[in-house]
Each structure stands twice: as C-alpha cells, then as structure tokens.
Curated annotation (Swiss-Prot):
Belongs to the class I-like SAM-binding methyltransferase superfamily. TRM61 family. Its main location: nucleus. PANTHER family: TRNA (ADENINE(58)-N(1))-METHYLTRANSFERASE (PTHR12133), TRNA (ADENINE(58)-N(1))-METHYLTRANSFERASE CATALYTIC SUBUNIT TRMT61A (PTHR12133:SF2). Catalytic subunit of tRNA (adenine-N(1)-)-methyltransferase, which catalyzes the formation of N(1)-methyladenine at position 58 (m1A58) in initiator methionyl-tRNA. GO terms for molecular function: catalytic activity, acting on RNA; tRNA (adenine(58)-N1)-methyltransferase activity. It comes from Dictyostelium discoideum (Social amoeba). This is tRNA (adenine(58)-N(1))-methyltransferase catalytic subunit trmt61a. S-adenosyl-L-methionine binds at residues 85, 112-114, 133, 138, 161-162, 183.
Amino acid sequence: MLNPNKIIKEGDRVVMYNGKDNMAVLTMESNNVYNSKFGSYRHKNIIGKEYGSKLSSDNGNGFCHVIAMTPELWSITLDHRTQILFNLDISTIIFNLELKNGSRAVESGTGSGSLSSSIARTIAPKGHLFTFEFHEERVKFARKDFKDNGLDQYITVTHRDACGKEGFLRQDINNDIDAVFLDLPSPWDAIENAIAVMHDGSMLCSFSPCIEQVQNTCLKLADSKFQEIKTIEVLIRTFDTRLQEYEELNLTNPYIDNNNNNNNNNNIEENRGKFEIGGIEGLKKDKLLSKPFTEARGHTGYLTFARYLPNA
C-alpha cells in the first residue's frame, strides 16, 4: 500500500477499476486470470505495466484501469467485518490527533482496519501503531490484511479487551504514546488504561454514535486531567449549482449624454435609439447560483477530542 514503485510487479496488490461502484482487489500472480463482466485479464499481461494504465481485455472488447492500492480505496473495497469509519471522519481524526511521521499511536478496536491503514500511512516510516481488538477472529483477519497490504511493519495487532486489567500495557510501550483512539461501546471505561501509556500533551479521540456516550466520556475526561475537550460531528453538505439568467436593473437615463453637458436634440435621439435597440435583452446576464440538495448522508458518529495535561 505504501509502495513507491510506478511499475507493477509480481506479488503487488492492485485495484482493477471500472468505476467507483465496480472495483476489485487483486494480488498479482503471473499464472492467474481476472474474470469480470468487462472481460478477462491475465496477470502476466498486467505485470510490468505502469500504475494507472488502461488495459484491454484478452478479447479486446472490454477495458479497465489498474491503479495502486491506497487506504481510501481499501476502505471502499475491504470486507466489512464491522461498521467502518469513512474517509471524512478518518481525515478529521488524523488531523486533530496531530499524527505525523514518527508518531506512536494506540487504537481500540481494530475492526475492519480502515482507520488503521490510514494511520499507518500517516506515521510511516518512523512511527508505529498498536491496535487492540477483543474479537479473536477479527484479529486474525486484520493481521492478514495488514501483511498483504505491506503495513505489518508499521502495525502491531494485539488480541485484548482494552477495558480490561492489562489495558494497553506492552513491553514495547512505555508512556511514549502520542495519540490514542477509542471506538468502544463504553470508552470511559478505557480512559484510565489510556492514561497509563500517554505522556504530557498526548491527544485522545473517542468515536461514539450516541450523544449519551459522549456525555459520559466527557465527564470522565474532565475528571482525569484532560483539557481542550471538544466534540464535533462531521457531515457532507452537497450543493447543486447552475447558471440562471437574470435581468440587471438599468438606472441610467438613456436620454442624457453624461459625456457632454450641452445636450442637444441629436444626443437625445442617438441615446434613445441605443436604448430601444438594446431593449431588455441587452441587460440580461448569467449568474451562478447554488442550493443544497434536499437529501444528504446522515449521522455517523460524534468525535470527542481531548489533550492530556496532568500538570496543568
């Protein structure tokens, strides 16, 4: 997924793209064939091509584009083992957690790995993500996905209940975590465990679908020496735009020549002719108008952010 190469090689994971609603993830193996309603494509004919190439099917009747895997495309094409976070929330989380190359982060739970992949790209190559998941089957799938996408060196998956006694403690974590993300039914129960691995100034984010969860989380954060507590909801509002013809009001007197104070009958007749020839049509213009669509994507969840400042 973080492959900088422009040329497709054996073993690369690619996306066969035929539109936003028709994508397939493939691992390049020279002996395999990809079959779709747009035709058949032999992997050996794809290997060696540049990412972004337009490919013709074996019979020449169809085509598709082969593009490199990204966390955004992975969020669209992955198997939804759980409800996932989408790109709008993910970008907001990464920005407000102040993640960057070299950051060390903790996440719970792992789920389908959508957010994990985006965090890994942000903190690579010097940073690391420790993600915790209580569901053993999801842990196995996540480890396989991260390995297949080339992210396993940046992500460590642990099978554990983040609200339990051990929490986020590991031998390779020692109060050096820069950011913690919680996507749990009761995130307030994991805040003490989060504090155990955070340092002064670390950021915490909690994702909760219900406002009652937000209220309990904020109360716990306020009692646990967190500052700068805020909760936001991110929604897309799409606008429809179009050009509208309208008539501009003409406030000038057509019978007066402003360039000549000594008006005469010739000026009056000349200006009257110009106005009558142009008429109303000569005053029409186009203006760009917009209005929001009546239907929009609804609520996903609330994002609560806070900074740990124990000495403040």
